[in-house]
From Swiss-Prot:
It holds the Pfam family SapB_2. Disulfide bonds join C26-C98, C29-C92, C56-C67. This is Pore-forming peptide amoebapore A. Optimum pH is 5.2. Keywords: Antibiotic, Antimicrobial, Disulfide bond, Signal. It comes from Entamoeba histolytica (strain ATCC 30459 / HM-1:IMSS / ABRM).
Length: 98
């Protein structure tokens, strides 16, 4: 009986819907873009590249998914969009994270 209860609790705890996963990924993405915008303004493009590289080397779960999307899109293109003052939600939509 304890095993069944444990399995049910475990299943419920990890039963995240695709919509909820998408919301999490989108929120992570917009937060990342805002962080990168601040970093780009204060430290420059090389620091943005270093930050993304460092983050992605340690990433797992949703962060790893986001890293894959960012790297597939291209860091230089991402930096250009940030420099062009494109909204974080629009950037995340372009990289298919929102």
């Amino acid at each position: 009986m304890k095993a069944i209860v444990f399995v049910l609790i475990f299943a419920v705890a990890f039963a995240v819907t695709a919509t909820h996963q998408g919301e999490i990924l989108c929120n992570l993405c917009t937060g990342l873009i805002n962080t990168l915008e601040n970093l780009l303004t204060t430290k420059g493009a090389d620091k943005v590249k270093d930050y993304i590289s460092s983050l992605c080397n340690k990433a797992s779960g949703f962060i790893a998914t986001l890293c894959t999307k960012v790297l597939d899109f291209g860091i230089d293109k991402l930096i250009q969009l940030i420099e062009d003052k494109v909204d974080a939600n629009a950037i995340c939509a372009k990289i298919h994270a929102c």
